[in-house]
Structures are given as structure tokens and as C-alpha cells.
Amino acid sequence: MKKMNKIYGLNIDMLRLCYEIKEPNNINILRTREIDEEVDFLYFYLRRIEGKHFKFVYEIRYNDLGIDKLFGELRLGINDDKEDSNFHSNGYAKAWISVSNRVLYSDEIYYLDFIEDNLGLELHNITALDLCLDLSCDVARMIRRLIRNKNVTTFLNTKEVKNRNEDRPEITYITSGNMNKDKYLTVSIKQKKAIKDKGKGTTLTAYNKKAEIANSSGKKYIEEFYNNPGKLHRLEVHLNNDEVKEYLNRTKQELSFYSLIDNRFLNDLFDQTLNSLIRFEYKG
């Protein structure tokens, strides 16, 4: 009997957030510390580290049953000598938190609300977000088959593709493997404005996640999160602030910490982004 394809789940894989500093007392203390100095907040602590693009960068760390863990990074003061870059239009100063990838595959993401509150921060916007759907079927090869199927109409960046012979720089295929054959396929689909700059527009990437873990990232905790499946393929969308903001405005929703743990919100955002990049219709 043929095995059914399995969907393991939709998850956040990358999360960078921008805040308003509502209560600056604790943040002001952080602006006085030197590299490697620590500031204790009872249930978590901050350690200042070197920063390239920001004046103050702190690791957010905590102790979990005797194990020291990294939650993410707090960043203050963009290093561009432009004061406006560090303030929102409403006058509040900016702060940024980047959440560790490992945390996103655990219940520890719930600590974020507590950390925000202790630092006097209020969420303003999502700076960058990766949402991924993990499943057992080779979704990259499935997408390529659909693109090349002449009996299927492809809609690329919401527009119907009518000339199949026209170059499509929005679509790229990357293969990898060993010296004898190509084993893995990665398909990338981008908005035109994202072709040269990932910081603009949305991007879809389909690839073999199990191979990527084994050959590149080494993030075994992702496989463990799904109970070590034999096959693990990923469909991943990347969004920036403008795309998330447009979705929130169109659906008349307000962003909060709870949006980040709301499966319905994440699923709807993923589906809209995916379908805006590419979708298929069988002719007839």
C-alpha cells in the first residue's frame, strides 16, 4: 500500500522584531555597560557582545535546570549616525529582538512576552519573518513538475504566465549531490523586487530539509521536534515588514505577541504569501 504524504506542521523559522521602548529605565542601564558585562533580570540576564551594525548588542540568556541557554539578541542603536533611524514616527525609541532558531522549535517562545515586559518594550512590527511548512513529500520536485506541465496554468506573482518560452528570472533551480549525480533540488521563487535584494519583497524556497541539516546547518533539534522523520522537505516563505504590514491592514488585525503563537494567523499569512508568489490551475 502506498504511504500517504504527511504534513508535519507550520512553524516560524526566523523571527526579527522591532519594538517601541515604552519604559526606558532598564534600557538606559544597558547603554552604560561594557563588552562582556552582564545585567541580571532575575529569570533571565543580558550579556553585552560585540556588534557591527548596532551600538549595543546583548545576548538574552537564561538558566533552564542548570543549563545556560540563548534565547536571542537585543539590539539598540543602529550604527549609521542618523538619529531618525532609531526612533519611530510616534517619537518612541526603537529596539530590536532577534529570536534564536532553536527557541522557535520549543515552547520557550512563550518567554518572549515576559522578556518584553521586563525590558519595557511594546511590539511595533515584524522586521523579518520566515514561515515554513514541513512535510514528507519532495515539494521542490512537485513544484517543478507543475511548472513544466503544459496542461497546468501557472500564476507567477499573481499574473498568469502566457508565454512559456519567456525567461523567468523569478524562478531558479539549484541542484546538489555527489560527484556522480545530482541528488537534491532547491526551487526558489521571488517577487521581482526581491531578485537582487532579499530585504525587499517576498521569497518562496522549497528544498530537502533533512539533507540541509545533514550537510549544512546541523540543526538536529528540528528533526527531533518532528520525532526524527525519515523524510523531511520544506516549503518556506520569507516576508519583510512591508508584507506583514500590508496583510495586517487588509485583514484589519493588530499585531501582538499573541499573533506569533496564533496558528490561524500564521497559516493565513503563509497561504496568502504562497499564493501571491505562485499558484497553479489545471486547464479545462
Where are each of the predicted segments found?
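Structured, helix-rich domain cores that form ligand/interaction pockets
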Residues: 1-284
